[in-house]
UniProtKB/Swiss-Prot annotation:
This is Conotoxin VnMKLT1-012. Keywords: Cleavage on pair of basic residues, Disulfide bond, Knottin, Neurotoxin, Secreted, Signal, Toxin. It is found in: Secreted. Residues 23-48 form a propeptide. GO terms for cellular component: extracellular region. It comes from Conus ventricosus (Mediterranean cone). The keyword Secreted applies. GO terms for molecular function: ion channel inhibitor activity; toxin activity.
């Protein structure tokens, strides 16, 4: 009984600690990158292509923003 109560208190404490020490109560990854965007060099960012067009080699099969279509299977689809 004592062990159960101690475990419940520990879980509640750790949960509260996580919420108190969090930087942002919203999903932090969604808001992390837009905050840092103003620190980027605008001239350097113009030279970087955002995505690869269809037919370009992309490396390995994965969905994501690497290809403009969002799909890669050796070449961008």
């Amino acid at each position: 009984m004592k062990l159960t109560c101690m475990m419940i208190v520990a879980v509640l404490f750790l949960t509260a600690w996580t919420f108190v020490t969090a930087d942002d109560s919203r999903n932090g990854l969604d808001y992390l990158f837009p905050k840092a965007r103003h620190e980027m060099n605008p001239k350097a960012s113009r030279d970087i292509k955002r995505c690869r067009p269809g037919g370009m080699i992309c490396g390995f099969p994965k969905p994501g923003p690497y290809c403009c279509s969002g799909w890669c299977f050796v070449v961008c689809l």
